[in-house]
Amino acid sequence: MAMGLIRMWVAVVLLGVLSGSPRDGGLPDRHGAGNVTSGVSTAAPTPSSVLQAGKLIALTFDDGPRPYVLFGSKGAYPAPGLADVLDKNGVKATFFVVGWRLTPKTWGDRHEEENIGVTCIDAAKQLAGRGYEFEDHTFSHIELRTAERKKGEQWVLHDVARGAEAIKAVTGVQPRYFRPPDWLISRDARSQLEHEGYRVLTISSEKPMALRDVNSLDYLCAGRHPVGCPKPSLQDGVLKQVEQREKKGIYTHILAFHELSTTAAAMPQLINDLKARGYRFVTLAEYMKLVASQGQ
């Protein structure tokens, strides 16, 4: 009789442990809600195949280099330095820069030097030396389809080439990737650039989702009176887009931002939230290699 009661008691205890209820001493579900920020889950169930291949984020930033964003600004509108935030979190990013900013004695370079004592060229050299990637965002930063209609395809191709030359002159590295301003470029010009060896980034559904940029919409959050900024915050808007892609089985993302002080301010929380979801941060070149190895 006593032995029977003991066996029953052991069975009940084991059942409680295996049931997984934290309330009765069981083990919590590893795929629970995780940390939640502003209603967006920062931890998500992940297929075992993705865990083996890796959950990847490539952070990219357009329109620089802007030293006051990269290294921070003080005064009436203080802002954290984007490069300092990335370094502190052990994240390497890719910068799609505008060639004219890397030309000595331009207004942009003089303006930055006067304001924070660092020129655009100096900023690019510093970051390249710290392991960041620099890629092509044209020389002139104008809308390329309009430029092609007015000036011809050769002008567009030459402007992209000038941007690449400016980057190589400063960093010593030939750009391999190109992002058109606002992703707007004619099919013919894009084909020609790809023929010349560029990978042209896009948001078009013509490409697999893993190779499409995720538009952060951060430019809508800039200025004193932003209109259209994702709610409740920029980082939550990005996380929602990541969640939507995860629901479609996509766990690799190229996130497209701009060199803006408001974006730099959002980065610490966004990086923490993405790390909590199991993501690893890589440069764009590393991302492309790893995604290719996954067969995406």
Predicted feature residues:
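Bacterial N-terminal signal peptides that target proteins for export
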Residues: 1-9
